[in-house]
Amino acid sequence: MEWWTAFQAFILGVVEGLTEFLPISSTGHQIIVADLIGFGGERAKAFNIIIQLAAILAVVWEFRGKIFQVVRDLPSQRQAQRFTANLLIAFFPAVVLGVLFADLIHEWLFNPITVALALVVGGVVMLWAERRKHVIRAEHVDDMTWKDALKIGCAQCLAMIPGTSRSGATIIGGLLFGLSRKAATEFSFFLAMPTMVGAAVYSGYVYRDLFRPEDLPVFAVGFVTSFVFAMLAVRALLKFIGNHSYAAFAWYRIAFGLLILATWQFHLIDWSTAGEV
């Protein structure tokens, strides 16, 4: 493995780990950064699956206590049964739309301009949602109803547009639907588990011929890096939301999106092949 390839894997692992669970769009950042450092082609498709799995495993590890409790109580406890049902209900809309439109979305929307516009629009919506007066109905994830879960699941479908952010769509959706900031964030993390695992399994099957033994060192670098930085990002976000709003992420989205649009408009960067991964 050449040093430059290892460096590319490290950078993209960092990007995936830091952005997957922050409301700033990991897919959008991956498209932009991968193009800037020249990481593309068939290997990139398999690599992205690996680093996404690493990120979700980091969340599983962070919430292992809650997961164990739910699994233990599922046969007999109503609360655990309702929580599991809510996750499945929220997961369902993304499954349906993903199966029907994933290839079409990847073909038509995976480009820097879509990413930039989605970043800006999402940032504006995030600012509006934060400044809007909220009536909190569900302080904790266990207080959610199936209707809350379904609405958040529908909001998650917006994240199929690159640049929108899965966590951003579900967290802001949760806030608008009456969840506390803590409940919306935690449910977003839990919903990421079946959603991302399902997407990774589906993509892994579709691109199964792209996994080659000679790429294992590259995958290992990306996997470890993504896992470590995702764990750090999750811990930092959970601590951050205790005393802060999501406004800082909103302004970052807007600034980053406008920067991408400016580089495209004034031909400062050639984005012609971005997204071809």
From Swiss-Prot:
It comes from the Bacteria. GO terms for molecular function: undecaprenyl-diphosphatase activity. The chain crosses the membrane at residues 47-67, 85-105, 108-128, 187-207, 218-238, 249-269. The keyword Glycoprotein does not apply. It catalyses: di-trans,octa-cis-undecaprenyl diphosphate + H2O = di-trans,octa-cis-undecaprenyl phosphate + phosphate + H(+). Its EC number is 3.6.1.27. GO terms for cellular component: plasma membrane. InterPro entries: UppP (IPR003824). It is found in: Cell inner membrane. Its main location: membrane. It is a multi-pass membrane protein. It holds the Pfam family BacA. One of its GO terms (biological process) is peptidoglycan metabolic process. Keywords: Antibiotic resistance, Cell inner membrane, Cell membrane, Cell shape, Cell wall biogenesis/degradation, Hydrolase, Membrane, Peptidoglycan synthesis, Transmembrane, Transmembrane helix. Belongs to the UppP family. Bacitracin is thought to be involved in the inhibition of peptidoglycan synthesis by sequestering undecaprenyl diphosphate, thereby reducing the pool of lipid carrier available. Catalyzes the dephosphorylation of undecaprenyl diphosphate (UPP). Confers resistance to bacitracin. This is Undecaprenyl-diphosphatase. It comes from Pseudomonas aeruginosa (strain ATCC 15692 / DSM 22644 / CIP 104116 / JCM 14847 / LMG 12228 / 1C / PRS 101 / PAO1). The gene is uppP.
